[in-house]
Design a protein with these regions (language model features):
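Membrane-proximal, lumen/periplasm-facing interface regions of secretory-pathway glyco-
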Residues: 286-343, 355
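Hydrophobic/aromatic-rich transmembrane helices and adjacent perimembrane loops
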Residues: 85, 89, 251-289
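Transmembrane catalytic cores of multi-pass membrane glycosyltransferases
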Residues: 38, 81-132, 136-139, 143, ...
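Membrane-interface alpha helices of multi-pass inner-membrane proteins
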Residues: 27-31, 66-81, 178-182, 249-255
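Transmembrane-helix signature of polytopic, membrane-embedded enzymes
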Residues: 3-29
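Short hydrophobic alpha-helices at membrane interfaces in multi-pass membrane enzymes
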Residues: 56-74, 110, 170-174, 242-249
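Short acidic/glycine- and proline-prone juxtamembrane loop motifs at membrane-interface regions
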Residues: 34-42
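Specific aromatic-rich, kink-prone transmembrane helix
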Residues: 5-8, 27-30, 42-60, 91-103
Protein backbone atom coordinates (compact mmCIF):
# COMPACT_ATOMS: atom_id res chain seq x y z
CA UNK A 1 0.00 0.00 0.00
CA UNK A 2 2.75 2.43 0.96
CA UNK A 3 4.73 1.70 -2.22
CA UNK A 4 1.75 2.16 -4.55
CA UNK A 5 0.67 5.31 -2.73
CA UNK A 6 4.18 6.79 -2.86
CA UNK A 7 4.37 6.14 -6.59
CA UNK A 8 0.97 7.71 -7.28
CA UNK A 9 1.71 10.82 -5.20
CA UNK A 10 5.21 11.15 -6.65
CA UNK A 11 3.85 10.83 -10.19
CA UNK A 12 1.23 13.50 -9.51
CA UNK A 13 3.72 15.95 -8.00
CA UNK A 14 6.59 15.57 -10.47
CA UNK A 15 4.44 14.74 -13.54
CA UNK A 16 7.00 12.20 -14.71
CA UNK A 17 6.13 8.51 -14.51
CA UNK A 18 9.68 7.31 -15.13
CA UNK A 19 11.21 9.43 -12.37
CA UNK A 20 8.39 8.47 -9.99
CA UNK A 21 8.88 4.77 -10.72
CA UNK A 22 12.65 4.76 -10.25
CA UNK A 23 12.60 6.90 -7.11
CA UNK A 24 9.82 4.79 -5.59
CA UNK A 25 11.94 1.67 -6.07
CA UNK A 26 14.89 3.45 -4.48
CA UNK A 27 12.76 4.66 -1.57
CA UNK A 28 11.41 1.15 -0.91
CA UNK A 29 14.96 -0.21 -0.81
CA UNK A 30 16.09 2.52 1.60
CA UNK A 31 13.04 1.94 3.82
CA UNK A 32 13.71 -1.76 4.35
CA UNK A 33 15.07 -1.21 7.87
CA UNK A 34 12.04 0.88 8.88
CA UNK A 35 9.28 -1.41 7.62
CA UNK A 36 7.88 -3.44 10.52
CA UNK A 37 4.53 -4.58 11.87
CA UNK A 38 4.22 -1.45 13.97
CA UNK A 39 2.01 1.63 14.06
CA UNK A 40 4.70 3.60 12.22
CA UNK A 41 3.78 1.81 8.98
CA UNK A 42 0.29 3.30 9.18
CA UNK A 43 1.83 6.66 10.07
CA UNK A 44 3.95 6.64 6.91
CA UNK A 45 0.84 6.08 4.80
CA UNK A 46 -1.00 8.88 6.60
CA UNK A 47 1.92 11.29 6.13
CA UNK A 48 1.95 10.58 2.39
CA UNK A 49 -1.81 11.23 2.28
CA UNK A 50 -1.25 14.47 4.21
CA UNK A 51 1.19 15.74 1.57
CA UNK A 52 -1.23 14.68 -1.16
CA UNK A 53 -4.16 16.54 0.45
CA UNK A 54 -2.11 19.71 1.06
CA UNK A 55 -0.69 19.82 -2.47
CA UNK A 56 -4.05 19.07 -4.10
CA UNK A 57 -5.82 21.72 -2.04
CA UNK A 58 -3.25 24.39 -2.90
CA UNK A 59 -3.76 23.61 -6.60
CA UNK A 60 -7.55 23.23 -6.96
CA UNK A 61 -8.84 24.76 -3.68
CA UNK A 62 -11.39 21.97 -3.12
CA UNK A 63 -12.57 21.81 0.49
CA UNK A 64 -12.81 18.01 0.57
CA UNK A 65 -9.04 17.86 1.01
CA UNK A 66 -9.33 19.96 4.18
CA UNK A 67 -11.84 17.45 5.55
CA UNK A 68 -9.36 14.71 4.66
CA UNK A 69 -6.63 16.50 6.65
CA UNK A 70 -8.85 16.68 9.72
CA UNK A 71 -9.68 12.98 9.38
CA UNK A 72 -5.98 12.11 9.08
CA UNK A 73 -5.23 14.08 12.25
CA UNK A 74 -7.90 12.17 14.19
CA UNK A 75 -6.63 8.80 12.93
CA UNK A 76 -3.01 9.67 13.77
CA UNK A 77 -3.90 10.78 17.29
CA UNK A 78 -5.65 7.45 17.90
CA UNK A 79 -3.32 5.09 16.03
CA UNK A 80 0.15 6.54 16.71
CA UNK A 81 0.02 9.54 19.01
CA UNK A 82 3.82 9.61 19.35
CA UNK A 83 4.13 11.07 15.83
CA UNK A 84 0.92 13.11 15.87
CA UNK A 85 2.84 16.40 16.47
CA UNK A 86 4.79 15.78 13.26
CA UNK A 87 1.50 16.08 11.36
CA UNK A 88 1.64 19.82 12.07
CA UNK A 89 5.29 20.02 11.03
CA UNK A 90 4.23 19.09 7.49
CA UNK A 91 2.17 22.31 7.31
CA UNK A 92 4.91 24.65 8.50
CA UNK A 93 6.93 24.99 5.25
CA UNK A 94 3.82 26.11 3.34
CA UNK A 95 2.84 28.56 6.08
CA UNK A 96 6.40 29.94 6.28
CA UNK A 97 6.54 30.48 2.51
CA UNK A 98 3.21 32.33 2.58
CA UNK A 99 4.30 34.57 5.48
CA UNK A 100 7.59 35.43 3.75
CA UNK A 101 5.73 36.22 0.51
CA UNK A 102 3.32 38.50 2.41
CA UNK A 103 6.18 40.31 4.16
CA UNK A 104 7.96 40.77 0.82
CA UNK A 105 4.79 42.30 -0.68
CA UNK A 106 4.43 44.78 2.18
CA UNK A 107 7.58 46.78 1.31
CA UNK A 108 7.54 47.96 4.90
CA UNK A 109 10.53 50.33 4.69
CA UNK A 110 9.25 52.27 1.67
CA UNK A 111 5.71 52.48 3.07
CA UNK A 112 7.09 53.75 6.39
CA UNK A 113 8.96 56.48 4.52
CA UNK A 114 5.73 57.44 2.68
CA UNK A 115 3.83 57.66 5.97
CA UNK A 116 6.64 59.78 7.42
CA UNK A 117 6.48 62.19 4.46
CA UNK A 118 2.70 62.55 4.81
CA UNK A 119 3.06 63.36 8.50
CA UNK A 120 5.70 65.99 7.73
CA UNK A 121 3.47 67.60 5.06
CA UNK A 122 0.60 67.76 7.52
CA UNK A 123 2.60 69.46 10.27
CA UNK A 124 4.88 71.71 8.18
CA UNK A 125 3.59 75.28 8.07
CA UNK A 126 6.24 76.49 5.66
CA UNK A 127 4.90 76.12 2.08
CA UNK A 128 8.38 75.67 0.65
CA UNK A 129 9.07 72.76 2.99
CA UNK A 130 5.66 71.28 2.18
CA UNK A 131 6.34 71.38 -1.57
CA UNK A 132 9.75 69.84 -1.08
CA UNK A 133 8.26 67.06 1.06
CA UNK A 134 5.49 66.49 -1.53
CA UNK A 135 8.18 65.99 -4.16
CA UNK A 136 9.89 63.49 -1.87
CA UNK A 137 6.51 61.78 -1.33
CA UNK A 138 5.95 61.38 -5.06
CA UNK A 139 9.44 59.94 -5.44
CA UNK A 140 8.72 57.47 -2.65
CA UNK A 141 5.47 56.40 -4.35
CA UNK A 142 7.33 55.81 -7.58
CA UNK A 143 9.94 53.86 -5.65
CA UNK A 144 7.14 51.73 -4.14
CA UNK A 145 5.72 50.93 -7.58
CA UNK A 146 9.17 49.99 -8.86
CA UNK A 147 9.69 47.77 -5.82
CA UNK A 148 6.38 45.99 -6.51
CA UNK A 149 7.33 45.47 -10.15
CA UNK A 150 10.76 44.16 -9.13
CA UNK A 151 9.14 41.69 -6.71
CA UNK A 152 6.77 40.41 -9.40
CA UNK A 153 9.62 40.10 -11.88
CA UNK A 154 11.75 38.20 -9.37
CA UNK A 155 8.89 35.78 -8.68
CA UNK A 156 8.29 35.23 -12.37
CA UNK A 157 11.98 34.63 -13.08
CA UNK A 158 13.70 33.55 -9.84
CA UNK A 159 17.39 32.75 -9.72
CA UNK A 160 17.28 29.63 -7.56
CA UNK A 161 14.35 29.71 -5.14
CA UNK A 162 10.74 30.01 -6.26
CA UNK A 163 8.38 31.86 -3.93
CA UNK A 164 4.63 31.54 -4.40
CA UNK A 165 2.01 33.55 -2.55
CA UNK A 166 -0.93 31.16 -2.37
CA UNK A 167 -3.86 32.63 -0.46
CA UNK A 168 -5.26 29.13 0.06
CA UNK A 169 -2.62 28.69 2.78
CA UNK A 170 -4.94 30.69 5.06
CA UNK A 171 -7.28 27.70 5.02
CA UNK A 172 -4.40 25.41 5.94
CA UNK A 173 -3.68 27.60 8.97
CA UNK A 174 -7.34 27.29 9.99
CA UNK A 175 -7.18 23.51 9.57
CA UNK A 176 -4.04 23.41 11.74
CA UNK A 177 -5.91 25.22 14.51
CA UNK A 178 -8.88 22.85 14.22
CA UNK A 179 -6.62 19.79 14.15
CA UNK A 180 -4.86 20.99 17.31
CA UNK A 181 -8.06 20.06 19.18
CA UNK A 182 -8.48 16.65 17.54
CA UNK A 183 -5.96 15.25 20.02
CA UNK A 184 -8.82 15.33 22.53
CA UNK A 185 -10.86 12.92 20.38
CA UNK A 186 -9.06 9.90 21.82
CA UNK A 187 -9.75 7.50 24.71
CA UNK A 188 -6.36 8.32 26.28
CA UNK A 189 -7.03 11.88 27.40
CA UNK A 190 -4.23 14.39 26.88
CA UNK A 191 -1.60 11.76 25.98
CA UNK A 192 -1.27 12.93 22.33
CA UNK A 193 -0.13 16.33 23.67
CA UNK A 194 2.28 15.02 26.32
CA UNK A 195 3.62 11.69 25.03
CA UNK A 196 6.35 13.06 22.77
CA UNK A 197 7.52 15.58 25.38
CA UNK A 198 7.74 12.93 28.12
CA UNK A 199 9.61 10.56 25.80
CA UNK A 200 12.16 13.21 24.83
CA UNK A 201 12.69 14.14 28.49
CA UNK A 202 13.29 10.51 29.49
CA UNK A 203 16.61 8.67 29.60
CA UNK A 204 15.75 6.56 26.54
CA UNK A 205 17.03 9.31 24.25
CA UNK A 206 20.57 8.18 25.14
CA UNK A 207 19.98 4.43 25.10
CA UNK A 208 17.51 3.47 22.34
CA UNK A 209 19.26 3.21 18.98
CA UNK A 210 16.59 4.92 16.88
CA UNK A 211 16.64 7.97 19.18
CA UNK A 212 20.38 8.55 18.85
CA UNK A 213 21.77 11.25 16.52
CA UNK A 214 22.52 10.35 12.92
CA UNK A 215 26.14 9.62 12.01
CA UNK A 216 26.63 9.92 8.27
CA UNK A 217 29.82 7.85 8.32
CA UNK A 218 27.80 4.85 9.53
CA UNK A 219 24.91 5.47 7.14
CA UNK A 220 26.29 5.65 3.61
CA UNK A 221 22.88 5.42 1.91
CA UNK A 222 21.56 8.47 3.76
CA UNK A 223 24.76 10.29 2.86
CA UNK A 224 24.09 9.42 -0.79
CA UNK A 225 20.60 10.96 -0.54
CA UNK A 226 22.05 14.20 0.82
CA UNK A 227 24.69 14.23 -1.93
CA UNK A 228 21.97 13.91 -4.59
CA UNK A 229 20.12 16.94 -3.22
CA UNK A 230 23.30 19.00 -2.94
CA UNK A 231 24.50 18.04 -6.41
CA UNK A 232 21.24 19.12 -8.05
CA UNK A 233 20.94 22.35 -6.08
CA UNK A 234 24.59 23.39 -6.43
CA UNK A 235 25.72 22.18 -9.84
CA UNK A 236 22.55 22.74 -11.89
CA UNK A 237 20.25 25.72 -12.38
CA UNK A 238 17.23 23.70 -11.23
CA UNK A 239 14.94 25.87 -9.11
CA UNK A 240 13.42 24.72 -5.84
CA UNK A 241 10.20 25.91 -4.24
CA UNK A 242 10.77 27.77 -0.97
CA UNK A 243 8.33 25.48 0.87
CA UNK A 244 10.27 22.45 -0.40
CA UNK A 245 13.53 24.01 0.76
CA UNK A 246 12.07 24.59 4.23
CA UNK A 247 10.75 21.01 4.32
CA UNK A 248 14.10 19.59 3.26
CA UNK A 249 16.02 21.71 5.76
CA UNK A 250 13.65 20.94 8.63
CA UNK A 251 13.58 17.18 8.12
CA UNK A 252 17.36 17.11 7.61
CA UNK A 253 17.76 18.83 10.99
CA UNK A 254 15.40 16.28 12.55
CA UNK A 255 17.46 13.45 11.02
CA UNK A 256 20.64 14.67 12.65
CA UNK A 257 18.80 14.96 15.96
CA UNK A 258 17.36 11.43 15.76
CA UNK A 259 18.15 8.73 13.20
CA UNK A 260 14.58 7.42 13.23
CA UNK A 261 13.60 10.50 11.18
CA UNK A 262 15.62 9.18 8.22
CA UNK A 263 12.47 7.32 7.20
CA UNK A 264 10.64 10.64 6.88
CA UNK A 265 13.55 12.04 4.88
CA UNK A 266 13.18 9.17 2.42
CA UNK A 267 9.39 9.42 2.17
CA UNK A 268 8.61 13.15 2.39
CA UNK A 269 11.78 14.53 0.82
CA UNK A 270 11.58 11.83 -1.82
CA UNK A 271 8.73 13.84 -3.35
CA UNK A 272 10.94 16.93 -3.39
CA UNK A 273 13.78 15.01 -5.04
CA UNK A 274 11.35 13.69 -7.66
CA UNK A 275 10.27 17.23 -8.55
CA UNK A 276 13.88 18.40 -8.84
CA UNK A 277 14.93 15.47 -11.03
CA UNK A 278 11.81 15.85 -13.18
CA UNK A 279 12.62 19.54 -13.77
CA UNK A 280 16.19 18.61 -14.60
CA UNK A 281 15.08 15.91 -17.05
CA UNK A 282 12.49 18.19 -18.65
CA UNK A 283 15.09 20.85 -19.33
CA UNK A 284 18.08 18.80 -20.44
CA UNK A 285 16.81 15.45 -21.68
CA UNK A 286 13.21 15.70 -22.86
CA UNK A 287 13.67 13.49 -25.95
CA UNK A 288 15.41 10.70 -24.06
CA UNK A 289 12.61 10.63 -21.49
CA UNK A 290 10.06 10.08 -24.25
CA UNK A 291 12.15 7.27 -25.76
CA UNK A 292 12.52 5.53 -22.39
CA UNK A 293 8.78 5.73 -21.71
CA UNK A 294 8.06 4.24 -25.10
CA UNK A 295 10.61 1.48 -24.46
CA UNK A 296 9.10 0.68 -21.05
CA UNK A 297 5.62 0.22 -22.55
CA UNK A 298 6.80 -2.51 -24.93
CA UNK A 299 6.58 -6.19 -23.95
CA UNK A 300 10.33 -6.36 -23.34
CA UNK A 301 10.20 -3.14 -21.34
CA UNK A 302 7.40 -4.47 -19.14
CA UNK A 303 9.33 -7.70 -18.53
CA UNK A 304 12.47 -5.76 -17.59
CA UNK A 305 10.47 -3.50 -15.28
CA UNK A 306 8.89 -6.53 -13.60
CA UNK A 307 12.31 -8.17 -13.26
CA UNK A 308 13.70 -5.00 -11.66
CA UNK A 309 10.86 -4.91 -9.13
CA UNK A 310 11.33 -8.60 -8.31
CA UNK A 311 15.09 -8.14 -7.95
CA UNK A 312 14.70 -5.32 -5.44
CA UNK A 313 12.04 -7.34 -3.58
CA UNK A 314 14.42 -10.31 -3.32
CA UNK A 315 17.27 -8.08 -2.13
CA UNK A 316 15.01 -6.65 0.60
CA UNK A 317 13.44 -9.97 1.60
CA UNK A 318 16.42 -12.36 1.41
CA UNK A 319 18.30 -11.14 4.54
CA UNK A 320 15.12 -11.57 6.58
CA UNK A 321 13.98 -14.90 5.10
CA UNK A 322 15.81 -17.03 7.67
CA UNK A 323 15.01 -14.86 10.68
CA UNK A 324 12.51 -15.81 13.35
CA UNK A 325 9.39 -13.70 13.58
CA UNK A 326 10.59 -12.53 17.00
CA UNK A 327 14.31 -11.98 17.34
CA UNK A 328 15.20 -13.08 20.88
CA UNK A 329 18.46 -11.13 20.75
CA UNK A 330 16.62 -7.87 20.09
CA UNK A 331 13.49 -8.43 22.20
CA UNK A 332 13.14 -9.73 25.81
CA UNK A 333 11.31 -12.92 24.77
CA UNK A 334 12.34 -14.99 27.80
CA UNK A 335 11.36 -12.23 30.21
CA UNK A 336 7.94 -11.94 28.55
CA UNK A 337 7.44 -15.73 28.73
CA UNK A 338 8.39 -15.74 32.43
CA UNK A 339 5.93 -12.95 33.20
CA UNK A 340 3.10 -14.72 31.37
CA UNK A 341 3.78 -18.08 33.06
CA UNK A 342 4.54 -17.02 36.64
CA UNK A 343 2.86 -13.69 37.38
CA UNK A 344 -0.72 -12.46 37.63
CA UNK A 345 -0.75 -10.30 34.51
CA UNK A 346 -4.29 -9.00 34.95
CA UNK A 347 -3.60 -7.51 38.38
CA UNK A 348 -0.01 -6.33 37.99
CA UNK A 349 1.60 -3.06 36.96
CA UNK A 350 4.92 -3.01 35.09
CA UNK A 351 7.05 0.13 35.12
CA UNK A 352 8.31 0.91 31.62
CA UNK A 353 10.26 4.18 31.36
CA UNK A 354 9.82 4.35 27.58
CA UNK A 355 6.02 4.51 27.81
Amino acid sequence: TLTVLMYQVMKKLCKNRLVAFLLTLGAVYLLQDFIAARAQLVSYILFVLTILCIENFLVNKKKRYLIGLIAISIILANVHCAVWPFFFVLFLPYVAEYIIACIADMHILVKAQIIGSRIKIKFFKNEEKQKREETILQNKKQKLEKAKQATEKLRAHPFKIQVTKNKAVKWLILVMIICAFTGLLTPIGDTPYTYLIKTMQGNTMDSISEHLPLTLYDDKLTMFVFVMFLAILIFTDTKIQLSDLFMLGGITYMCFMSRRQVSLLIIICGFILAKLIAKLAEKYDRKEKKKMLEAMTTILGKLLTLALVMLISIVVFKPKAGQHFINSSAYPVEAADYILENLDVENMRIYNEYN
